[in-house]
Amino acid sequence: MVYGLTLLLLFAACGEDKPQPLSIQVVPAKQIGDTKGSEYANWDTVEFTGGGGVTYLVASEPLLTEWNIVACKIADGGSQTKIVAARLNAYGSKKMQEFSENTVNLKQPLGLKIGDRWANFNPLLNQVQDRIQLRGFTAAEAEQFQRDLADR
């Protein structure tokens, strides 16, 4: 009897609906007018309504995902947005260092995709070491992302 109740409680606990972890992607991007050549053939087109409605091409592979972030702090970004100051794992840090060491990539936009929403396309202004600021989170997204990191 006790064994049966234990199994029942275990199955009930496993059946709880937990919210899906928030997906984060940082992706190289270019304004569509700045893209010439076959290297952009596999990039996707994004109509970004923020910032005056600009069309971007974004790389098919992200530079970073939520799995490259090991810790974060949340700051107020103004205009009802939040900034996530993220510390990167070794793989993400190495990848961003290599990307940002190429001066051609500096001052070029990086697309930030949060879930299914393109949050912004801010330029990469400085070389990245092991930390990066991600702008454009809503308060709810920033809080959920912080919980997701704590639950890993």
Predicted regions and their residues:
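Structural signature of multi-pass, alpha-helical inner-membrane proteins
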Residues: 14-152
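Sec-dependent bacterial lipoprotein signal peptides
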Residues: 1-12
